[in-house]
Amino acid sequence: MEKIKEPIDVVILNAGGVIGKTAAKITPSGMNELAATNILGNVILVEELIKRDNLRKTVLSVSAEAVPGVKMLGVKPVSMRTSSVDEFAAVLDGSYFGKKFNALQAYAYVKYAETMWTLSMARKYPKLKFVVVSPGNTKGTQAPDSLPPPMRFMLKFVMMPIVFPLMGGMVHTLDVGAKRFVDAISDERYKSGVFYASKEGKLSGDMVDQSTFFTDLKNTSFQDNANDAIHHFINYGQFFASAQGKFTGN
């Protein structure tokens, strides 16, 4: 952070993915690797930039249509019992899912937590633009590479080139996915505090406000609960690092 001398206009938070075999492994922060990779660094980066007055305009947080679900593909919407701080914390350390941890399912819940943190930040910092965007189902990325081999093969060589184009509104090129980010940053039609992604049940096409059909996104208490849960792990990680330094003499 000390090397950033000039204020930054735009930050795109695109770190993350399904991770792969180590997704459930617990990190020093207390989050599992899936949550830490998708959330931890993003949150710390943005909040440190704000603290140092080094962020001028926009934060774009990358989410996914997996949050509201895609019925045609059998992807169910994220459905939490209470969206309490404790429940979000259980998502972030993986205990929410019990012994049968499925990284693809957990990914949607982790993205929901990151999305809700972003929406909470939009209310906390009204002079900045905090917008959430899904790039949609985009060809030509390395996103499938962390999937199990059979699923990776099906997605890359069957679903993407053959099945999705036949279904309509389910896939697009890398340029189209990137344009979603550019539009959300530069076009005033896209407002702070909103999650924009494909129309309900789709993975491509026009972007719409997801809260029109996934109403939990509007719940400000849920948003703040996600924020509080994330900071539980940030504070734990900082304490852990401090304690480790004392024991090692650093």
Regions found by a protein language model. Name each.
Residues 1-144, 235, 241, 245:
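Rossmann-fold NAD(P)H-dependent dehydrogenase/reductase core
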Residues 124, 132-146, 194-215, 247-249:
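C-terminal/domain-terminus segments
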Residues 34, 169, 215-218:
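Pocket-edge positions in alpha/beta enzyme catalytic cores
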Residues 98-104, 137-139, 143-175, 211:
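Alpha-helical membrane-targeting segments
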Residues 218-220, 224-250:
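Intracellular terminal tails of multi-pass secondary transporters
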Residues 23-27, 95-97, 157-160, 203-209:
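Surface-exposed beta-strand-to-loop junctions
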Residues 160-211, 222, 228, 232, ...:
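C-terminal helical subdomain
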Residues 55, 143-147, 187-192:
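Glycine/proline-rich active-site loop of Rossmann-fold NAD(P)-dependent oxidoreductases
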